[in-house]
Amino acid sequence: MPTNVSGTKDVPIMKCPVCKTPELQMMDVEDGLTFYNCPQCCGNWVKGAEYWKWLEQHGPNLPERSAADSKLLLAEPGFHIDCPECRFRMVKYLVGHGLSFTLDHCEGCKGVWFDRNEWEALKERNLHDDLHSMLTSFWQNAAHKEARKKRLEQIYIARFGPDDFAEIARVRAWLEARANKQHLIAFLTDKDPFDL
């Protein structure tokens, strides 16, 4: 059962950065890793130093699992929130790797806020031990590129329809594998390739 954070003398009272009112409740989620949980929105705060300590004791980095249709309901609020520990405005970081949510990271105290089920979604994919990588520009560039690709794909599906988009994507992949790709494209785009 979670213990009240305000019940300890050396730990300041932390309020939920999303709901603003409930005190965060201390709870162990992994062996050696403590979260501070909001009983109202089910979000979780993990202190940066505690995560790093857990990561060092965790063992080797687990291999990423392939994307699967998760049944977890996520509850990302969509607005910027302030750190429950030091009150800095937190920065949103895209997770990527097939997951479309963001994590809120405090640049001041290095803690991370997980909205409902975000930690669980990371664990399903074995990405929960990669937070340090997610906060790098390399990871973020790849995550933003993935998000742009997904948005453009949705635009093309809306424009062409799902069946036509699937077919043109198949043809495009086929063309990319051909050495004479430019000649094939010229043939396709010529109004009448048989008119000399």
Language-model-derived ranges and their functions:
Residues 32-43, 100-112:
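Cysteine-rich micro-motifs
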Residues 16-19, 38, 83-86, 106:
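Short cysteine-rich clusters marking metal-coordination/redox-active sites
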Residues 5-15, 27-32, 70-80, 95-100:
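Short, flexible, mixed-charge glycine/proline-rich loop motifs
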Residues 173-196:
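C-terminal, charged low-complexity interaction regions
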